[in-house]
Structures are given as structure tokens and as C-alpha cells.
Amino acid sequence: MSALLMTKALRQLDPQKLAKEASCITELNKRFAVAKVGGKTLVLDTFSETLDALSFRDFENMYNNVDVMMGKSSSRLGKYWLYHANRRQYLDGITFQPGNVVAQSQYNLWSGFAVEPDDTLGCSLFLEHLKTVICSGSDLQNEYFLNWLALMVQHPGRLPEVAIGLLSGQGTGKGLFMQYLGSLFGRHYKHITDKNHLLGNFSGHLHDAVLVFADELSWTGNKSDAGILKALITEPTRFMEKKFADAIQVKNCTHLIFASNETWAIPAESTD
């Protein structure tokens, strides 16, 4: 079984436990939590890659077909969980603090790295590809990039305030390099191929991004793009906004890498 299939299997809730009074709350708590999101109180689906937020009514409707048996009587699972004293909840809202412990009353969007360190293994081929291909054999570029990557891994919550640009022809391994690098971060790695998904108003999909790969984005010379991009690279906070939901401010931990086959890869000015 692949790692992806194993992960999905582990993230499934047990239908039998959901139908029992003694286990249904604990089982639903694995996936759902009540939290303050902007000015609303909603139910977070923590298994969702985009952290879907449901209204109480929508959550109840989702589980209206499940009855919790309590002796000779029963209750609808959704309503039973919502009004239970032991439901999972974060009444002080959402925060994004990679690598940090937060208050129990807050939901930390950071879920950790997707892999565990193993001192018995090496990454010599990856490092060789980084130096000879990505950095064109330059010791200076290689050292700078390695330090940039080390900061991201050792302190994922620290904003580097510098973006990396990978410029080369097709077929040089930029995408393969990013696949391996992104696998360290799991859900905190975002592969973007549309400029609007990076700079558009609705950036909820970037809510928990640590590493963002902007792959062959097309720039039109719009000056506002440069301003938004600069803020994403340098500002300590940003707004997380989804359609039909209030925007909330979260910590900006974006480590941005661009890749392009074109000479003009990003809308940067000469002084940037």
C-alpha cells in the first residue's frame, strides 16, 4: 500500500465507534473541532487539506443519518456532538505557529513535518543535484541556497524575507528537485501553477503554507502584482481569506521558490 493510501486509511473515522455513546465523541474529535473563525463560530474539518469550515447546521446535516444509541433511546450524532461538553474546541481561534507550542484554546495550523529524521540514511544524490544542476556548480550559490533551506527546516516559522528563483531551460530537474523538497513538508507544501492562486483575493489554500513552489507563472506587467508579491515575501503577517468567509490574519511563514524557463521570472524591480 502506498504512503498516500495508508495516510488516507488512517484518517478514516470508525463507523461503529460513531454509533456508540461511549466512543462517538472521541472519534469525531479526531477530525472535527469547533473554533472561532473571524467573527463566526464554525466546525473545522481538520482532515481537509484546505481546512473546510462548516456551519453548525451543515455539520448536523452531515451526520443526520447516524444515530447514537443511549440505552433504549437514540440521538442524532451531529447534534449530540455539538452540544456535548467534551467536544473538541478552540474558542480563541486559529493561529499558525510552525514549530511552536500554542495555547490549548487555539488551533495551530501547523501539523508538523511529513517525515521523521533518520541518521542512518543519506541524501548525497539530492545534494549533488542541488549543487551541480540547480546552482550550476557555483559554490557561492550552493552555500547560500543550503543556508536558506536549513533556515526553513530548522525554523519553519521564521520568514526568510528572500525568495529563490530557479531559471533554466526545460528538462533540467527543477520540478523533480521541488517534489523531493516538498515531500518534507506534506500539507505545508503548495505547488502553484496559476498566478491568481498565489496573488488572488481568495488565498485560503495557502493558510498553512511553509514552502510554496511558484511553477512557471505568467506575469503581465501589472504593477500591483509586484506589491502583493513583495508583501508575501517580506511582511510578517498576511490575511487568510476564503470565499463566503471572513478574512483572518495569520503569521506569514512563506518560503517562496520560483521556477521559470523564461528570462523574466518574477515582477521584480532593479532595487529589489
Language-model segment annotations:
Residues 1-143, 151, 204-206, 264:
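N-terminal nucleic-acid engagement/recognition segments and initiation subdomains in replication
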